[in-house]
Amino acid sequence: MKTLDMLKPGENAVITGINGQNTSLRRRLLDMGLTLNTKVSLVREAPFGDPIELEVRGYSLTIRKSDAQLIEVK
């Protein structure tokens, strides 16, 4: 299983699932546009690897690497 935090800058992927028991975090990720079958691209990582900047649906989104670990991609 590959997760969003495993992408390298410039790589693209498609979201296949969101894991985790925390429903408020899951809802927040969905509200930010991180839904199933959405194409995402890792733009860059912060100097120490956290957070990461994504391009989702034509806009930039920055999330924590710990949150990215919950998002399955292919």
What do these predicted regions represent?
Residues 5, 16, 71-73:
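Intrinsically disordered, low-complexity, charged/polar segments
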Residues 24-28:
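Short alpha-helix capping/helix-loop boundary micro-motifs
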Residues 46-74:
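C-terminal structural segments of small proteins and small subunits
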